[in-house]
Amino acid sequence: EPDLLVSILGNEIFKKPIINLAKKGCINLHTALLPKYRGLMPSFWVLKNNEEFTGVSVFFVDEGIDSGPIIVQKKVKINNLTQQELIKITKKIGMDAIAEAIDLIEKDDFDLIENDDSKKTYYSFPKRSDVKDFYNKGKRFF
C-alpha cells in the first residue's frame, strides 16, 4: 500500500479507486498557476494570452480536471521566452515544488490553497487559428 502517489504533468483523469489507493492521497504537478489555465498545454496559452507571470501548482488530485486543493505554488516571470524555454523553466521549478509538497505532506505541515472554480479557465489543444494568432503576436515555439 503506497503512502503517496505522484503524477507529473499527468493528462489522465484519475478515478476514485486510483486517487484513494495511497494513504496520503495523490498529487499532481501542473505547469500553471491554478485555478487559471486548467487543462492542456498551459505554456502555449500563457504565452498566447500575453501573461506576465505563470508558474507551477502541486495539488491533490480529485476526479475533476486540475481542480483539487493546491499544496504548493511557485510563480515565474515570463519575459520574452519561447515556449521551449518556458517549459524548461517550469519543469525545473516544478520538480522543486514537488519535492517541497512531498516534504510538507510527510510532515503533515501544510495549508491548502483553494483552487477556486469561479476563477478557473480551461484550455484544450490549440487550433490552427490559435497557432496563427500565437505567431502573429510574435511568440515562438523555439
Per-segment meaning from a language model:
Residues 4-129, 133:
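Donor/substrate-binding cores of folate-linked one-carbon enzymes
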Residues 139-142:
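SAM-dependent methyltransferases
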